[in-house]
């Protein structure tokens, strides 16, 4: 199974669409089963950045795209927009043998992230459910 992981795309004023298009082309040539984007899809969490990012990410020819928010995605009103543009599940089965579990550490308008006690308890319970699978935590 091939999984591609991306992070820190930062669609915004400094974003290089031509460079990201080459990345998309490379990913498509690999034909992975899934793509995981681990935060900072946008730079300021603005609606036009989400729209552009969604349009570009939609060019990736893959069955499953799993996006996790980063601190930049939660800036301004981005925390209200993320789920609209990138709906996600916290438990993602990939094939018969792999599960990818996501944790969110972003907080609105804060640079630092946090995985708290309740999330750690949830993670422990969730991983036990999949004891017979390879587990990836992102």
Q: Can you say where each PLM-predicted feature lies in the sequence?
A:
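N-terminal active-site segment of His-dependent metallophosphoesterases
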Residues: 1-56
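Active-site-proximal beta-strand elements of phosphoester/diester hydrolases
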Residues: 1-10, 98-107, 136-138
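Extended active-site neighborhood of metal-dependent phosphoesterases/phosphodiesterases
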Residues: 47-134
């Amino acid at each position: 199974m091939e999984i591609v992981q991306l992070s820190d795309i930062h669609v915004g004023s400094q974003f290089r669409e031509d460079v990201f298009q080459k990345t998309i082309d490379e990913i498509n040539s690999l034909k992975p089963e899934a793509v995981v984007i681990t935060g900072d899809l946008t730079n300021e969490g603005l609606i036009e950045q989400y729209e552009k990012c969604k349009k570009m990410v939609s060019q990736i020819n893959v069955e499953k795209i799993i996006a996790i928010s980063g601190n930049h995605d939660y800036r301004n009103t981005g925390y209200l927009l993320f789920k609209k543009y990138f709906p996600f599940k916290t438990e993602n089965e990939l094939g018969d043998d792999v599960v990818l579990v996501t944790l969110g550490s972003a907080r609105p308008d804060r640079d630092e992230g946090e995985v708290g006690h309740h999330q750690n308890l949830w993670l422990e319970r969730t991983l036990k459910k999949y004891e017979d699978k390879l587990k990836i935590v992102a």
